[in-house]
UniProtKB/Swiss-Prot annotation:
InterPro entries: ArsR-like_HTH (IPR011991), AsnC-type_HTH_dom (IPR000485), HTH-Siroheme_Decarb (IPR050684), PF0864-like_C (IPR054609), Tscrpt_reg_AsnC-like (IPR019888), WH-like_DNA-bd_sf (IPR036388), WH_DNA-bd_sf (IPR036390). Residues 25-44 bind DNA. This is Uncharacterized HTH-type transcriptional regulator PYRAB09690. It comes from Pyrococcus abyssi (strain GE5 / Orsay). The lineage of its organism: Archaea, Methanobacteriati, Methanobacteriota, Thermococci, Thermococcales. It holds the Pfam family AsnC_trans_reg_3. Keywords: DNA-binding, Transcription, Transcription regulation. Gene3D superfamilies: 3.30.70.920, Winged helix-like DNA-binding domain superfamily/Winged helix DNA-binding domain (1.10.10.10). GO terms for molecular function: sequence-specific DNA binding. The keyword Transcription applies. The keyword DNA-binding applies. Residues 6-71 form the HTH asnC-type domain.
């Protein structure tokens, strides 16, 4: 779905709900100075079109990780190339099982990218060393500690496991 299929009212509704999904239809209609029936209809259509998939929460400071690192894993090409895809699937499932691993994605043919969180830089690096760098047949593990988030600070709170 592209932004072109959204008009200004749809975008305004989405912006408000993104900021606070607890808003009632009455509150949204008051803020946008539109009838409640219009807002209700638009939200229903946004849901039917799959633009609004679900309503969720972003956990706050007491729960979300204090330190983050982006980790890029390069997988060694196995002798039998057909095993690469299965091994990457195994590694991504293994990483996904850790609560410290907030996000896992495949990048290209031989790389996996993960966002990892921890309470302190020391615990974060120890987790990476003990649980990620120890995975067999990795050619390289690059760790990029995140010192400051410029946009998307809520992502860790959204991804954090409870």
């Amino acid at each position: 779905m592209t932004n072109a299929s959204l008009d200004d009212l749809d975008r305004a509704i989405l912006k408000l709900l993104k900021k606070d999904a607890r808003l009632t239809i009455a509150e949204i209609s008051n803020q946008l100075k539109k009838p409640e029936s219009t807002v209700h209809f638009r939200i229903k259509k946004l849901q039917e079109r799959g633009i609004i998939e679900k309503y969720t929460i972003i956990v706050g400071e007491p729960i979300k990780p204090r330190k983050l690192a982006l980790v890029v894993l390069e997988i060694d090409m196995p002798i039998i190339e057909d095993f690469l895809e299965r091994y990457i699937e195994y590694v991504t499932k293994t990483l996904s099982g850790f609560s410290e691993v907030l996000f896992v994605a495949k990048s290209g043919k031989e790389k996996i990218v993960a966002l990892v969180g921890g309470e302190s830089e020391e615990s974060l690096l120890k987790f990476i060393e003990d649980n990620i760098e120890s995975i067999p047949t990795l050619r390289n593990v690059m760790v990029f500690p995140i010192s400051e988030i410029k946009k998307g600070d809520e992502i860790a709170g959204f991804l954090a496991e409870v």
